[in-house]
Amino acid sequence: MARVFRRECHRVLDSERTTIQGADGMLMVPQLAIAGVNKQERGDFGVALSEVLAVWKYFLLDKLQLSHKDIPLPQSYDLIRKEYDCFLKRTNTVDLIDVFSMFKELRLNEDPEEPLTTMQMFQFLFGENESSEKPSQPVCPATPSCKAADCSPQIQRVVRRVFCSYLDLLVNSKNDLALTYTLDNPNRSLGHTAFTDLRHAACDSASSLFLTVTSFVRAIQLGGKGYAPPESHPLRKHVKGLSEFLNFVDQCQDILGETPNPREAGCKLVSSIRAALVKGRSAGDPVYLAAEESTKSLKERIGQIHAMHTQSTVGTGISPARPKAYAINHATAYGGRETVKVLMALLDEEALALPCRNKAELLSEDHAALNGSTGACLLALYKSPEAPTGSSPKSLRNRVLSQQEHIKSKVVRPTIRSQFACTYKEEELPLNRVLEFPSTSQIPTCVHPAPKKASSESDNGMDNRFKEATNLRCEGPGQSALGEHSGNAWNQTGGKSTQPEPLRRATGTLKRKLANRECTEQGREENQPPQKRPPAKAATGGPGKRNNKAVSKKLIAGQGKLTGFFRL
């Protein structure tokens, strides 16, 4: 059925790269459609599992044109069906029911009859024949296997879906569901917020998710300053992760176009995806085991499909014709054309695989085991994060983190200080130092001078302090007037360097005060620059004294001749 559809689909479809949604994908798309309708009607993007299963059963009966009189019509079924059809058309995909319907129209006389009836197709999709096909459990349990225990069926299913989604994205770049599974697998820090921003940007530009990523990253890489997206663009904060994702897809496309052998190209693609998924994981990791198993099975199946295509081409005895205009990519590029055929056949077989038995597990499973983060199911990933309000506050952890970030943003970064930064403390700014002004009755012991006083009493006090300091300086070591309790005694034999530092600074300050007062008395202002000192008198003895010293130097033997020779 899928082989006939793939051979004749150019007669009914616009694109030959249309891919098929399997049974599991057909169940996930109605879930998103129902949640979207509930968002429009109730304002909440969500849906119950029972509602999904009820709509799913009615939808299958309605699309297969079976009787559904005993089943009530779900609420807003017309809108849900419209959303479902729009999603398939927008992503360039068809479901199994469409393939089943097209097979009746597209098959030729030499093709086999219908492999399934309509009721069998319904039972296959809805899962009513699972109980009869399910193998019975053995009475005695088998020996427990470490590999089976570590690698659960859920992880195997998720890992294999990621492999097929990467291959699907190479064939059909419009498949948004394939990009959803591959965007953050492996972990690229593109979580819920990044996917929401990407989805909103795609809605604004009316394009697919992959085309939005490609346009944004290419505009930054090749557009230059004038054509690059503005800094306010919502995808600007996810540039690193989006660039990593697009670079990996570019590497896969290079393998697809540069490797002529389809089998070799397919094996290289699968190996590249495996290397990306198992990077940084140990050999006993469940994801590592599932990736190894998926890689082995996919490589074997790619080799078998390539052998089948080769036999069908060579067995006719006729050389293959030139590529037709409608084949694969409308004759735009023939590189990797045969490889794309093999990948499409592989994806068609994956779409015809048995659906998942546990529908609840399928709709609620997440990818946290793959990317190492708090992943979410497909429904929660498509749900836009709501702004916190009074009725729905943030969690305590988020509030604490936001408060810490707010405090960190207010901390003033240390500025570049001068070479005198050692004179003030680290936590204080240079201009915020405290100036201490001692009273006029105390001897100034701080670095900063005391404020100027305009009264004559302060001048008299300064004169008295200067005289006291002078008297103390003139006294000998045995004539200390203040005694040891004052702390102002010093040894006269030590000279100026042995004087206490506070008293020496105070003496210099008082000398400057006296000089300023003398200048004021002579009619000059205090701020007037000081007069230049008169030039020193010339040294006695005449100018010839220095020349005589220079002439008195004796020459070495032969120095005069050598000097005259070099002067010439």
Curated annotation (Swiss-Prot):
Domain of life: Eukaryota
Main location (coarse class): cytoplasm
Location(s), subcellular: Cytoplasm; Nucleus
Protein name in the entry: PCNA-interacting partner
Role: Required to suppress inappropriate homologous recombination, thereby playing a central role DNA repair and in the maintenance of genomic stability.
Keyword Ribonucleoprotein among UniProt keywords: no
Keywords from the named record: Cytoplasm, DNA damage, DNA repair, DNA-binding, Nucleus
InterPro entries, A to Z: PARPBP
Entry's Gene Ontology cellular component terms: chromatin; cytoplasm; nucleus
Span list, region Disordered: 442-555
